[in-house]
Amino acid sequence: MLKNNIKLIGYLIRQKNHAILQTKMITVANGHRIIPLTVHVADTPKKRDKGLMFVENLPENEGMLFVFSAKTYGGFWMKNTLIPLSIAFLDSNGKILKILDMVPCKGNFCPTYDPELYYHYAIEVNLGWYKRNQIKEGDFVMFV
């Protein structure tokens, strides 16, 4: 059992204070190499609203994939999020349009991290993961 009570059961995951979420393996290509990333899929309004709230630890090559049925506009906030994150906003082809760093918010008034563009997907990972892997705007995510 992992420290943060994450138990892998096939392609499903149960986290403390979270419902069962489907996981998916994706890859991120930076022009020099392909980096695998396991993501927890948030594809309903309820799952997207919960996001990574109350998660105390996120393994290094894991994240959360937010899937929207159509292009969307607007930002993310970090209310009740305990760990700092980086987020990439993608178009419908998987092209990374914008990457932002986000810090936890302990108060009631939390800033919104807004890419100020339309996007189809968003991927949250540990703070600095994109930078450590030399992933930048214009790179692509492949949904395997």
Q: Predicted segment positions?
A:
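Helix-rich terminal scaffold detector
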Residues: 2-5
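Compact, glycine-rich, soluble single-domain proteins
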Residues: 8-144
